[in-house]
């Protein structure tokens, strides 16, 4: 009985690892030039406040991820995620969050 439970959870764990490594994530994509340029412009404004710089970086990452599924999330989604906005590219369609979003709709 214990052997069966152990084998079951081992197989389940391995399947999850394989699935996790096979899906593409937003963090795995290289940052587009438009994203880095926009981030640099905002960081220049917050040069004297390092705490705001960290917050700006975090907000940009969050907005980039949100823009992948909703191009009207923020005004500059086409700069943050040109892979998905204004038109979804094959790279965009391979992302896990985009696949999940398309399944729901």
From Swiss-Prot:
Main location as per UniProt: secreted
Record's comment on post-translational modification: Contains 3 disulfide bonds.
Tissues expressing this chain: Expressed by the venom gland.
Protein localization: Secreted
Single GO MF descriptor: toxin activity
Name assigned to this protein: U-scoloptoxin(10)-Sm3a
Keywords tagged on the record: Disulfide bond, Secreted, Signal, Toxin
One term under GO cellular component: extracellular region
UniProt record similarity statement: Belongs to the scoloptoxin-10 family.
Signal peptide from the UniProt entry: 1-23
Bilayer-crossing regions: none
Species assigned in the record: Scolopendra morsitans (Tanzanian blue ringleg centipede)
């Amino acid at each position: 009985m214990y052997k069966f439970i152990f084998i079951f959870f081992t197989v389940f764990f391995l399947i999850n690892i394989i699935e996790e490594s096979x899906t593409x994530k937003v963090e795995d994509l290289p940052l587009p030039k438009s994203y880095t340029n926009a981030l640099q412009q905002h960081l220049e404004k917050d040069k004297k406040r390092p705490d705001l710089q960290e917050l700006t970086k975090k907000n940009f990452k969050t907005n980039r991820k949100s823009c992948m599924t909703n191009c009207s999330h923020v005004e500059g989604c086409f700069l943050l995620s040109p892979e998905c906005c204004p038109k979804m590219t094959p790279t965009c369609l391979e992302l896990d969050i985009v696949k999940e979003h398309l399944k729901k709709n």
